[in-house]
């Protein structure tokens, strides 16, 4: 309930002076005025109501017994003023009640909150209230002081309750403490909190909190009484409470003499007098605050009623806050449950998706392995037939064999890309780091793409800004080589005839930078975000003009990420593109390896450099690869013996001119095998080739990468045996 903006005990003449000031102000503003005399209300407490367009004011005066003073209060809350008018309406003659209705109608448009008084009116009131009055009423000073002390005590208790409301949202604890403190302050025998509940259209209530003076006072906690709805409250009383009015009964036996049921109830629970104030939460009667006097009838003082009313208002705030907190906690629990359910559903969906993804990748990997073996044989046999020494091929035969060879090679490259991508996505890709020459790496990559550049009539250049002292890099040679080959191949593919592709390399502090720049068709800005996604071609028109499965750049990105590097693209449509790769340098844990000559002639060369003669021993456990190698070397005129283990004595007993050791090396320690062979044979007597990734094996003459490309493989073997043939001469 709104509190007065002014509440003091004043001499009667000062009240009259305040009323005179208000009447003058109302007359000047054309405001409506209603006084006790106009409605002839049967009350000895004078009042004055002023209602203007922008504010309303109620001046109340309650006589102080045995003193010529009033307790003067000023309220500016329209709702409180309307409640006051409805309260006195029953005491006003019927012919005067239209005056009250008229004032109530004028109050309706005003806001329910306190209105700001006009400045001149506030100044006039302050001038009156500021005058010295104590000299004219010295006899009432002790009573005034006592009243002020009581008021201060009430305000302290209100402050304590308000503080507790702010500090705690636990309603049971708050109400339990509040009823104890209020009972002690009012000095009553029993203080109760009752709560209403609407069930199946019937109003029911129950005492939920209680504080008794001592154990002799019987407890009414949880009591329900059918007499007069609840605890002696008839429907009219319930309506009064709902409107915010208090029920004040000094002597129950006398007041409810005509209600035996209620008299019996009061006698049973030793109730002589009660004071009931409503607890209204959000304009709904939530419950009541009840004070019982059990030893005697009690004349309840206006300040006691007012104090209990103020406390009920603070409790209303606490109850509303607790309800909001409870609803919030319930909503929080509901949301948490929904989040947990949604999270679990997402986990299950993610798990199912990951399982499907793994199955797909496993299937791709399995099928790629199964397809790669026969394709390797097809490529090898077609390459062997192209060099068939027993008779010349017709033009048509050669054309068909070249189609078979090129188509098989293209399909094998696609399958290898799918296999590499599947392994990368499954997290199975591992780097096989070794030390290598950056310049030699670039030379090897340019040599691989040189035939493609020649076919497309594209000028292929390089700019290597690598000082000799920093020509060494520690990384996966095959992966980095494939990164550069993919970028160079794409650049050549999308560069028109007479265009240019440049490979650059330089150090930027501790980062090795590779850059491939072309003068090709460029990439539209809105499509550049798709570059590194698998199975992506930038436009359907590109797919018709340029072949490819859209895996090269996706694999490139995976391999760059494996090296903890980065890749960037800068492209302008119609002018060309620049791809830049940065690879961080890491420490080389191994000593410098020997530097064999790695220059490789163009792959288009098919000329045999020496006359094939002598025996070559192949050590391999892979039947398909071994069959292909034997076919290639036998067709070229070599005698080939295939072993599945690397027993040294058996190898040397065959007196080979070269030993090919193929990955995987499950047949023993390769370095130990090479050392034993080198102890018995010099490089001029025996060549040792590793078929697989480049490593740091001491005593090895040449590394030939897998899978086998027949033309390149034969060139590598022939070149490796050149020095042997020269020394034999």
UniProtKB/Swiss-Prot annotation:
This is Circadian input-output histidine kinase CikA. Coiled coil: none annotated. Residues 366-587 form the Histidine kinase domain. Changing residue 627 to R: Loss of KaiB binding. It comes from the Bacteria. Functions in an input pathway to the Kai circadian clock. Senses oxidized quinones via its C-terminal pseudo-receiver domain, providing a link between cell metabolism and the clock. Affects the ratio of phosphorylated to unphosphorylated KaiC, binds quinones via its pseudo-receptor domain. Quinone-binding destabilizes the protein rapidly. Autophosphorylates, does not transfer the phosphate to its pseudo-receiver (PsR) domain. May play a role in cell division. Also functions in a two-component CikA/RpaA output pathway from the circadian clock, negatively regulating kaiBC expression independently of labA and of sasA. One of three clock output pathways. Dephosphorylates phospho-RpaA, enhanced by KaiB and KaiC, has only modest kinase activity on RpaA. Residues 170-314 are annotated as: GAF domain. Homodimer. Part of the circadian clock (KaiA, KaiB, KaiC, CikA, RpaA, SasA), the composition of which varies during the circadian cycle. KaiA and CikA compete for binding to KaiB(fs). The PsR domain binds the KaiB:KaiC CI complex but poorly to either protein alone. KaiA and CikA bind to the same region of the KaiB(fs) form and therefore compete. The gene is cikA. The keyword Kinase applies. The modification Phosphohistidine is found at residue 369. Keywords: ATP-binding, Biological rhythms, Cell cycle, Cell division, Kinase, Nucleotide-binding, Phosphoprotein, Transferase, Two-component regulatory system. The lineage of its organism: Bacteria, Bacillati, Cyanobacteriota, Cyanophyceae, Acaryochloridales. InterPro entries: CheY-like_superfamily, GAF, GAF-like_dom_sf, HATPase_C_sf, His_kinase_dom, HisK_dim/P_dom, HisK_dim/P_sf, Phyto_chromo_attachment. Residues 613-729 are annotated as: PsR domain, binds KaiB. One of its GO terms (biological process) is cell division. GO terms for molecular function: ATP binding; phosphorelay sensor kinase activity. It catalyses: ATP + protein L-histidine = ADP + protein N-phospho-L-histidine. It comes from Thermosynechococcus vestitus (strain NIES-2133 / IAM M-273 / BP-1).
